[in-house]
Amino acid sequence: MNVLILLGIVSLFIFGRKVSSNWITGIKDTLNKMMDFSTDRRLFSSWTANPIGWTRNTQCWARAYNWSGTAAGIMGLGGVGGGSLISRRHVLLADHVPYPARPFEIFFVNRPGKTFTYKVTKIDSVPGTDIAIGTLDQDADPSLVTYRVLPNDWARYVQGLTIGTAMGIEVVTLRLPVLYLNQEKMVSTGDIVRLVSGAAQVEPPAFAPAQAYYQVQRGGDSGNPIFVQVGDELVLLGAWHQIGVFPWILTHKGAIEAIIGQKLLVADLSGFTRVA
């Protein structure tokens, strides 16, 4: 069977409905269908050095989502580090990563497999966080996705979420299934379990079928993105800072928008049932 036809059939099977009545239940249903397809976690099956380019892995278990806005590589980092498009001209990075002298090259691969090379001309830090914003030398190609963030009222759609305090600090407890990348561009599963002072904490997934797709973070994974699924869309939550922890991008939304000079794109949760 033609590969494109097969992918179309699988995509229809996975994303038959854009949303379900319950957001978290819909995520788990989609994960189950995706995991039935494959256990291969690699976004790319191979790469070439001259000319530099990556081949998308058609057997990746999460290949039905759009990963084209995640950097395939950064020149001068030896394979570590990562970045994600938050506008046509800006990339979310981790501030503590020792990026090369500016300008340096960053690479993206669209869904058909074409590699695009851009230069990061400057990096702005969000004060008091590990968030950095890289500016590209030109607008990213329209075939590369710019990721959205959650709306401000996202918590109203999460069953069982609680808000408390510990030593005067607000602590949000929840179970939110997420997908994330590591330095080898492999797709893993996990659960956000706490939000404390603008930092999200990730643990192995409680959802049993997803546990086989979990991999603990390591040094070198910093800057690679963490997403939550909203229907057929990956929505950006942040980028790795340290093992199991990353800055919650919504906490610093205003500061990020001031740097990029525009509003971040916001995902639509209105089709889901509010539970709070």
Spans of features found by a protein language model:
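A short alpha-helix/helix-coil micro-patch that ends at or immediately precedes a cysteine
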Residues: 90-100, 140, 174-176, 180
